[in-house]
Amino acid sequence: VSNFSAQKTGSYQLQVTQPDTLLSHLTRLTQNRLSQQTLKQLLKNGSVWLQTPNRKPERVRRAKKILSSGQKLFLYYRPELLRLTPPTPTCLADYGDYSVWHKPKGMASQGSKWGDAHALYRWVETHDASQRPALIVHRLDKHTDGIMLLAHGKKVAAQLSQLFESRQTEKRYLAWVEGCFEPQKKLCEEPIEGKAARSWLQRLMQEIEVQGERTLLEIQIETGRKHQIRRHCTALGHPIIGDRLYGQSEKWQGMDMQLSNYFLSFPCPISQQIRTFNLTTQPQWLELMELAWGKNWVIKNS
């Protein structure tokens, strides 16, 4: 075991040589430098993993679980995650086998080895009264808000995943971008990491602010490459306002990324009915947009 620091980010591991509880082994791993309450919080946050010989590491949370000789314990420790409180998502509909959520900006779609307490699926598992498992079937960037589906069983998860993979879903995005975008609907086919990528971009409105010109786009994608919309907007010379990775200009500094997955339509895997969700019909979402941009930006429902 390397020296543990309660103030620094680090990854640590411990070879289990004798049976004892997970909490006791975690105490050894952290060299008694964290309280029992903090250790339990790390378990709850999903920062602790256990590897059994000839198997992949798995996330473990139960403090009283007995570990066996030969197993290996891993801790992925980021002290700042202990202090973070995730934003609150909104349930748009619950069909029992799956539910529909509005994921806010700043909430991850999925966890990482460092933890999953701030991911949408884990928030739902720990806050929803039904205590059902929540499985992700598609993703949104952490800094993009929008509509997400969560499955509550493996069968429905596979069915919903197939809908996205076979492009039986319709997704539409809204993005405020820098500059004056041309009025004609535009197709961007700039390859991403050597793979084909297609995005349609349509100007809805544009305004002149103190910081400069900005345009509201509606975007639909035919492929799902990583950061596709953000990369294509930047490739066209109109980076998304607030995008710190692909071309944030100084005049728009301090703003959240102005990208929302506002529309989702898909065939229900249970009833076969077409389910359609549109955030522009949600008062809470409209209030957030009006707070950021004023009341004149809202588009017509389609």
Locations of the language-model features?
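Short beta-strand or tight-loop elements
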Residues: P87, P133, Y173, C188, ...
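Short histidine-centered loop motifs in beta-beta connectors
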Residues: V60, Q202-L204, G212, L217-Q220
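A generic structural motif
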Residues: Q51, E178, Q220, P267-P269
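Short beta-strand segments enriched for Tyr within beta-sheet-rich domains
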Residues: L160, R225-C233
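Conserved hydrophobic positions within beta-strands
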Residues: C91, V177, W200-R203, I240
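RNA pseudouridine synthases
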Residues: V1-E193, L286-W293, K300
